[in-house]
Amino acid sequence: MNTKITNIIEDLKSLTLLEAAELIKQIEETFDVDASITSQSQAIVMPTAVDNSNKNEIEEKTEFDIILEEVPAAKKIAILKVVRSITGLGLKEAKALVESAPKMIKDNTNKENSEEIKQQLEEAGAKVSIK
């Protein structure tokens, strides 16, 4: 056996359990691998990059931003009332927000709340998107 490998093996034998756990953690982070045991009889080291891409595709978005896209002039007052009730802004601030469309009305809302807000604004005549 190569002397370099022999030295590494001897160093590994002298590690405590805590040091061995830290070594495994560092190897996983450095080489982007997963050293967890996947079956009773064997340990398989697998790259985690593939797993991460699959997780990202499966994850469902939980926080949404509501964007006020367009405000027809004829519906401006009705939309202004809805925006004030949603945001809690004063008349002046809500008017500035409505007049500066496209503009974010609310951020980081859950799916149900964002759909409800979108429906209220669309009923008032606004064009709204959820991102």
Swiss-Prot record:
Ranges of Basic and acidic residues composition bias in the record: 106-125
GO cellular component, one term: chloroplast
Organism (species): Gracilaria tenuistipitata var. liui
Top-level taxon of origin: Eukaryota
Xref: InterPro entries: Ribosomal_bL12, Ribosomal_bL12_C, Ribosomal_bL12_C/ClpS-like, Ribosomal_bL12_oligo, Ribosomal_bL12_oligo_N_sf
This protein's record includes keyword Ribonucleoprotein: yes
Gene Ontology biological-process annotations: translation
Subunit comment: Homodimer. Part of the ribosomal stalk of the 50S ribosomal subunit. Forms a multimeric L10(L12)X complex, where L10 forms an elongated spine to which 2 to 4 L12 dimers bind in a sequential fashion. Binds GTP-bound translation factors.
Family assignment from sequence similarity: Belongs to the bacterial ribosomal protein bL12 family.
Major localization listed first in the record, in broad terms: plastid
Function: Forms part of the ribosomal stalk which helps the ribosome interact with GTP-bound translation factors. Is thus essential for accurate translation.
Pfam family, one: Ribosomal_L12
Gene Ontology molecular functions: mRNA binding; structural constituent of ribosome
Region (Disordered): 106-131
Name the record gives this protein: Large ribosomal subunit protein bL12c
Keywords recorded for this protein, A-Z: Chloroplast, Plastid, Ribonucleoprotein, Ribosomal protein
Subcellular location: Plastid, Chloroplast
